[in-house]
Each structure stands twice: as structure tokens, then as C-alpha cells.
């Protein structure tokens, strides 16, 4: 068996094309275009790359993009004041604060300062709580994008044994809620998990998000499993690798996401979808 690659890049491009058409239709109907404020604090190279990709995607689909590049020494109070201003700006439908933040700024305080109806990253406790209550509105972008990828396989998720490796607030925890909502029996593994290999081998659907290249050996993959690799790790030779040993895993899986070109583009596509949703549902 050789796994089919799930082409996140192509699927994300299709979503962006559809969004561009919807934005054009809004303009023709005399409605304003959706607006996204992107806030970057500091000069972390990886964050700068991510923010640049998000801003370019905004412009591609015709959104209003507001950029705020703040110095590393920006105080927490100054950042919160900027968020307050964006909260009250009628041209802005979504606010994104790129994480991680400098150590002197408390991330939870910043996330909770963003109005839930403008929380297009889906990190606010209100929006995570909506997902937990099975009434999602603005959903965490990476898990949302992963669910879109899984749907393209045509495989029915109801009754599948799903295993998530990694329990972060950004991916692992909301991912478990998404898969629970999709009818899976979910297991979330983390640093204290015992017998990780045994749990991974039982997974019909495996999502790995730990940030360690090749962390999951390919021979652990159950024959016919769907493998979603969230990891983006830069190796010493400059190449990118995922958290799963791709070649060996491809011999067992039925579907697998490549790195790069799998989950990454879908995160940005989901961010754009959330921004349009916020404009249509909350601010029109």
C-alpha cells in the first residue's frame, strides 16, 4: 500500500478562489470587504514568515489587511490598548495576534482581550467553549483546516479510533473536540502518556503535532490509517520535515499529509474563512 497524499496546497488554493469570488460579490452588492488586523510583536523570524503569508493571502482574496508591527519592548498595556482599538473599529472583522509573544506579555490575557466575535484564530475561551458544547462558531484554524482535509478523503469519520499526539491549546486540545464532534473515539497523548506506540498503532486516524522531526516511526502506523502531520521542522540542511517519518508511514497509511504543503496552507485558508464568517454573521 502506498498512501495518497492529501494536497493541502491545492485544497487551500481552491478555498481562496471561492473566497475571492464571495468578496467580489459583496463589493458588487455594495457591501464592504472583510477586514483583518494582523498584530506582530517582536522580530521572531518564523513569526515574520507566518505573518507575511497571512497578509499576502488577505490581499489575494480581496480582504482589507491592517498590519501592526510592534517592537519587542512593547508593553502588555500598549498591546491591549491596540486590541481595544481594533475591537471598536467597524472596518475590522478579525483580529490576529501572532504567537508566541515576548515573555513579559501574558498570552491568555491578550487572547481574552480580543472580542469573541473578532477572534478569527478561534483561541478565545468563549469560542473553544462553543466547540466543546457542540455549537461551534469561530473555530481554531489548524484543527478546522485539518477537518477540511479529512473530508476530502471521503472517509466517514464516525466510529473511527482517532489519536492526537500533542495537547497544545492551539492544535491538540481543540483537535480532540473537533474529532469528537465528527463521531470519532478520541485519545489525546501528551508528555505523560504511557505506551505511546501501542496507542498510535491502534489509530484509524492519527494527528501529530509535537514539533519534533520524525517523532513517530512509520512502522507504528496502522495499515489503512489516515495520517495528519502538523509538524513543520527545519533540519540542519535547511529542508523541512514533519513529526512523522513520511516515507515509512506512506507504506502503511491510506492517506497522508506531506510537509510542506499539507496542513500549513489550510491554517491560513481557515483563517480567511473565519474572517468572512465573522463579517457575514456578526458585522453585516
From Swiss-Prot:
Pathway annotation from the record: One-carbon metabolism; tetrahydrofolate interconversion
Keyword Hydrolase: yes
A GO CC term attached to the entry: cytosol
Entry keywords, A to Z: Amino-acid biosynthesis, Histidine biosynthesis, Hydrolase, Methionine biosynthesis, Multifunctional enzyme, NADP, One-carbon metabolism, Oxidoreductase, Purine biosynthesis
Any one Pfam family match given in the protein's UniProt record, by short name: THF_DHG_CYH
Molecular function terms from GO: methenyltetrahydrofolate cyclohydrolase activity; methylenetetrahydrofolate dehydrogenase (NADP+) activity
CDD domains according to UniProt: NAD_bind_m-THF_DH_Cyclohyd
Function per UniProt: Catalyzes the oxidation of 5,10-methylenetetrahydrofolate to 5,10-methenyltetrahydrofolate and then the hydrolysis of 5,10-methenyltetrahydrofolate to 10-formyltetrahydrofolate.
Family according to the record: Belongs to the tetrahydrofolate dehydrogenase/cyclohydrolase family.
PANTHER family linked: C-1-TETRAHYDROFOLATE SYNTHASE, CYTOPLASMIC (PTHR48099:SF5), C-1-TETRAHYDROFOLATE SYNTHASE, CYTOPLASMIC-RELATED (PTHR48099)
Protein name in UniProt: Bifunctional protein FolD
Source organism of the structure: Shewanella sediminis (strain HAW-EB3)
Amino acid at each position: 500500500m502506498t498512501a495518497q497524499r492529501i494536497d493541502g496546497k491545492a485544497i487551500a488554493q481552491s478555498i481562496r478562489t471561492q473566497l475571492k469570488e464571495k468578496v467580489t460579490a459583496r463589493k458588487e452588492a455594495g457591501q464592504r470587504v472583510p477586514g483583518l488586523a494582523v498584530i506582530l510583536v517582536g522580530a521572531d523570524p518564523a513569526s515574520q514568515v507566518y505573518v507575511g503569508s497571512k497578509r499576502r493571502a488577505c490581499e489575494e482574496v480581496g480582504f482589507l489587511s491592517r498590519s501592526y508591527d510592534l517592537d519587542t519592548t512593547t508593553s502588555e498595556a500598549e498591546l491591549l490598548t491596540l486590541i481595544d482599538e481594533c475591537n471598536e473599529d467597524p472596518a475590522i472583522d478579525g483580529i490576529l495576534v501572532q504567537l508566541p509573544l515576548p515573555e513579559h506579555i501574558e498570552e491568555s490575557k491578550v487572547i481574552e482581550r480580543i472580542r469573541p466575535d473578532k477572534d478569527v484564530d478561534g483561541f478565545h475561551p468563549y469560542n473553544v467553549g462553543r466547540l466543546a458544547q457542540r455549537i461551534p462558531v469561530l473555530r481554531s484554524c489548524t484543527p478546522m483546516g485539518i477537518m477540511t482535509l479529512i473530508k476530502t478523503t471521503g472517509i466517514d469519520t464516525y466510529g473511527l479510533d482517532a489519536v492526537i499526539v500533542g495537547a497544545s491549546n492551539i492544535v491538540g486540545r481543540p483537535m480532540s473536540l473537533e474529532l469528537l464532534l465528527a463521531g470519532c473515539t478520541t485519545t489525546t497523548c501528551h508528555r505523560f502518556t504511557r505506551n505511546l506506540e501501542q496507542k498510535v498503532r491502534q489509530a484509524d486516524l492519527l494527528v501529530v503535532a509535537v514539533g519534533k522531526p520524525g517523532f513517530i516511526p512509520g512502522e507504528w502506523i496502522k495499515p489503512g490509517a489516515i495520517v495528519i502531520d502538523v509538524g513543520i521542522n527545519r533540519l540542519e540542511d535547511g529542508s523541512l520535515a514533519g513529526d512523522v517519518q513520511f516515507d515509512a508511514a506512506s507504506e502503511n497509511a491510506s492517506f497522508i499529509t506531506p510537509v510542506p504543503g499539507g496542513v500549513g496552507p489550510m491554517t491560513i485558508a481557515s483563517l480567511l474563512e473565519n474572517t468572512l464568517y465573522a463579517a457575514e454573521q456578526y458585522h453585516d
